[in-house]
Amino acid sequence: SGHYEMGVLQSKMHMAWMRAVAGRMKSDYQYSAQIVYNNFPWPDLPEKLEPNQPQTPTHKAQAAIEKAAQAVLDARAQFPGSSLADLYDPLTMPPALLKAHQKLDAAVDAAYALVGGKKTWKNDAERVAFLFERYQHLTSLLPAAKGKGKEKAKGKAGRKQA
């Protein structure tokens, strides 16, 4: 249906990633498929649910994202005369659209919770830190060492030169 992908791409999780890795031209973000999209660490969810297959938590997470993404589209459709710029103006965003996005963010966060993320995030910095850890896990041949880099850096800085 495409609603799953659209939902993840419209989420706070993806927006935080985009703001962290996208280039900029003046104050505008430059969304690059090669840098932003292709390197985005998607949640591990199945492609589709096969007939007569029991629903797993990942299938339920995918269905929740699809449903929430459709709710965002439905909320936008309530304002056919409004442009996206008008709908997403922080001062005048319709409450129904804001609520739909909040539900979408919760559904996406729940999907990431299945792969080690939190169910709620304090801020975008936490989201981005998790996404970079996930990216490292997905692209590394060896498991990521937690905290090792900080300890090594402290140890080298604290050593006296002989």
Where are these regions (language model features)?
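S-adenosyl-L-methionine
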Residues: 1-162
